[in-house]
Amino acid sequence: MASRLPILIIGAGISGLTTARLLTNSGIPNIVFEASSPDRRQGFAISLREWGYTILLSALGDLPLRSLTRGVAPDREIGGSGWIDQAVWDNGTAKKLFVPDANSSTKELIVRANRNALRRWIADCGEEELDVRYGHRLKRVEGSLGDVRVEFENGAFYRGLMVVAADGVNSTVRSQVLAHVQPETVPAVLYHGEFQLPRADFDRLFRPHTGESNILAGVGDGFNTPFAVCNMTKTHVHMDWSYSRPVRGSGEDDPLYRPNLASEEAKRIPTALVEELASRDLAEPWSLFLNGEAIQHHRVFHWAVRCVSVTREDMQRAVGRGVAFVGDSWHAMPIFGGEGGNHALADGIELAGAIAAGATGDLGTAIGNYYDQAWKRSQDAVRRSKQRFYTLHRPMAEWRELSKKKPL
């Protein structure tokens, strides 16, 4: 791997920036290309599991957890640490059902992280600034391992040692290198809303339920309505909500199952959603924000729930084309359960580590070593995430039965 051609990373999300930061910290040249502008918004929060943030902090030089939470926690501006209580609430009665593993000595500490803040924090964890070039939407990938060429829609061309595909579930790189791998649509309905409210209103309406927790996880009879803090200041709280359930029947007669909506149409609030929310008989605080009048003042999106699975042979074939995959480009999974961001971090850490460890050897072998670790880990997670969707959208009778067995 004597060549000083840079590694070309397509996508400035969590996986791409993690890869770039660790390669840069190891002295390996790389450039990150991002289709959107620097001010793109993706300010919702994600759950970082203990195994995910532990390996990240270790890879960045054994940083303390407080360094991470001070930089990324949704409530960092008021001294919070992104803590969540993991409690499950009945959204029809506003009563707490249970706390998973409440009395377990091995209960996992989950940290909530604002996505924008996490990207900035990762990018800043090193002495040398990352080379991130915005406004570069990929058009073409050509060549082979050791000498790849990429062309962008703005007319720019670059040569590199290899390409890292960090460009998400609808990966342009994957569509060209592994065209037969298509995202699978999970038969689920998911609407996501964002809103802001004064801090005093948050303290009055949510604090009695959440305390210091950054999530209020509400479940109903086969549907979910979690609230989450995205960002909190002394005066205002930016929050989001989700409304999700399995598709009814085959989906053909389900007015809310619309997996192939155009992006502009996905931002419109359908009458069927308003009617369905009204039929749910929600308790406060859910009823105050999930109603036809309130959501007209929110930014509401219809999200298609998709996942991506690949074979080990697919990945090896891509190596010959000079491409390695990280993040959702090769293991997109439903958001329920909070694993996707953690595997994106792990990918970046493991790929950068394999490349650095094999810096004096064969690059193809180094990438193969990465997949020896990452393929089973990530593909097992895709399978788990699909199963978890149905577990998290069970009938209320099952939730109440569970609550009898688990402590508050």
UniProtKB/Swiss-Prot annotation:
Pathway: Secondary metabolite biosynthesis. Pfam families: FAD_binding_3. Its EC number is 1.-.-.-. GO terms for molecular function: FAD binding; monooxygenase activity. It is an enzyme of class 1 (oxidoreductase). Glycans are attached at N91, N103, N170, N231. One of its GO terms (biological process) is secondary metabolite biosynthetic process. FAD binds at E34, A45, R119, D328, G341. InterPro entries: FAD-bd, FAD/NAD-bd_sf. Keywords: FAD, Flavoprotein, Glycoprotein, Monooxygenase, Oxidoreductase, Signal. Its cofactor is FAD. Residues 1-20 form the signal peptide. Belongs to the paxM FAD-dependent monooxygenase family. FAD-dependent monooxygenase; part of the gene cluster that mediates the biosynthesis of neosartoricin, a prenylated anthracenone that exhibits T-cell antiproliferative activity, suggestive of a physiological role as an immunosuppressive agent. The non-reducing polyketide synthase nscA probably synthesizes and cyclizes the decaketide backbone. The hydrolase nscB then mediates the product release through hydrolysis followed by spontaneous decarboxylation. The prenyltransferase nscD catalyzes the addition of the dimethylallyl group to the aromatic C5. This is FAD-dependent monooxygenase nscC.
